[in-house]
Amino acid sequence: MTSTLHRTPLATAGLALVVALGGCGGGGGDSRETPPYVPKATTVDATTPAPAAEPLTIASPMFADGAPIPVQFSCKGANVAPPLTWSSPAGAAELALVVDDPDAVGGLYVHWIVTGIAPGSGSTADGQTPAGGHSVPNSGGRQGYFGPCPPAGTGTHHYRFTLYHLPVALQLPPGATGVQAAQAIAQAASGQARLVGTFEG
């Protein structure tokens, strides 16, 4: 005689509840705890940026670039060199200064050449030659500064104060003066900075 067990809906629901509760128990279930939050480490680049290289510059406290040169620095005044300030990047064996007039009646005229200027930053007062500098004869054969002196009626002349960065010690051709010396300096330079002043003829 076969006996058939008939479960009521209520009994079935009760059994399901017991199974569900058993799965949430402490002994038989997966009770692993969530690990504590650990913030991700941030990597900071501690490398100090290299300082910017000092630029090659030249200026004068007596006149701005493109402005008139005061009379005291011309042949109509005391005819002394204007005060200058300059800076240069590392890597120079020496600096050189050339002052010329491309508007001269007879063609380019070199007024002043100074070689052997100490690299770095520097300045001069009125009438001074840059530290360590040696004057080379200009277009007139004069060793030293000769200021603006354009003939009357020749209009505006532009006087270029050009500072050259020389990577190796300068070797001028024997007897080089004026334009020839200025050209040799320009060819040997690895950089230049320029200040231009004007003077009326």
From Swiss-Prot:
Described function: Probably involved in bacterial recognition and uptake by its host (human).
PROSITE patterns cross-referenced by the UniProt entry: PROKAR_LIPOPROTEIN
Topology in membrane: Lipid-anchor
Domain comment in the entry: Fragments of the mature protein (residues 77-96, 97-116 and 117-136) prevent uptake of M.tuberculosis by a human macrophage-like cell line.
Species of the source: Mycobacterium tuberculosis (strain ATCC 25618 / H37Rv)
CDD domains xref list: PEBP_bact_arch
Pfam families in the record: PBP (PF01161)
Lipidation feature positions (S-diacylglycerol cysteine): 24
Lipidation (N-palmitoyl cysteine): 24
Record family assignment: Belongs to the UPF0098 family.
Name of the protein in its database record: Putative lipoprotein LppC
Matching InterPro entries: PEBP, PEBP-like_sf, YbhB_YbcL/LppC-like
Swiss-Prot/TrEMBL keywords: Cell membrane, Lipoprotein, Membrane, Palmitate, Signal
